[in-house]
Amino acid sequence: MILAIILFVLLAVSVLANFTQFVSHFTPGKSKMVRSVGPKLDEVYLEDNDAQYKMAVVDIRGIIADQAIGQDGYTAIDLIKAQLKAAQEDRKVKAVILRVDSPGGEVLAADEIKRAIAEFETGEKGKQGKPVIASMGSLAASGGYYVSAPCQWIVANEMTITGSIGVIMDAWNYRGLMDKVGLRPDVYKSGKFKDMLSGSRSTNEIPAGEREMVQKLIDEVYGKFKNVVADGRSAAHEKNGSEGKALVGNWQDYADGRVLSGSEAFQYGFVDQLGNFDDAVKKAKKIANISSANLIQYQQRYDISDLFHLFGKSQAPAIKVDLGMDLPKVEAGHLYYLWRPEK
């Protein structure tokens, strides 16, 4: 009975809102209501210091992927871009703290985030640039470091797992299993490389030069990663001067896919400071040249229409098994900036 009353009230509010919007289209002097593009955000105070200025915290957690994270179809990348845009447009926001706890993920998704951070700092598209300070949690490896590289200042804990600068791609070969069960594929293709990375081929069916082509692609994306590290750390050192850390001369020797502790990353110049989130906040205020600031975060807001969209789902819910751990969802043939320890 109570649930029925709640649903009736929600329905009445929704009908009233839609009616108001409909009438506004035909009322003189009223502007047309337009739904904003991108995720809807609410500003939430994490720490209210009754200050004039603000600093925004943007979280990057888990596997970095360009996948929808809610019923509205927006991806994690959309949400991060929207948060940066809100911080850019708010004159009271003087800096962003990028809180990273991620093993990395998809190459393109990581690059989209890196690009958004770089544009935020340089103030492209006619907007004023603002500093971004990265605060690494327990894990900021591979793509997690990639998105941190363009930040003006990077703080890591001594025990942070970072580094893992490199690219990985899986290609499974199951031809031996197919032979055991009596299966043999018939493939019709337009060129000898059209079924590149197909796992249904035997070793002698793989065309000469295919492995070299795949490795060339890996090396190209790997080179991009190293350029992002070199450019980001060089630009940061120019801004920070003697306060920051410069990459050591042989830094590429440590960019071979190995993981580094926060202490090692500091020693080789991959991070500027050893500390925690509070230290990153203090440094952000110093870089922004402010003595005090309110700490805020932009959280995604869901309105009544989103609620009814959820109730109106017609598809059956998927059955999910909780294994107690967050396993990377890696697909064969995809490029990843990802640290993926074998379990």
PLM ranges: what are they?
Residues 2-129, 139-235, 293-343:
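Small-residue-centered hinge/linker elements
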Residues 99, 132-134, 270:
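Short catalytic-loop micro-motif centered on adjacent basic/acidic residues
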Residues 115, 273-288, 292-301:
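Extended, non-catalytic substrate-recognition/exosite surfaces adjacent to catalytic cores, especially
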Residues 131-141, 254-257:
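Glycine-rich beta-to-alpha transition loops that act as phosphate-gripper elements at the mouths
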Residues 209-282:
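Flexible, glycine-rich surface segments
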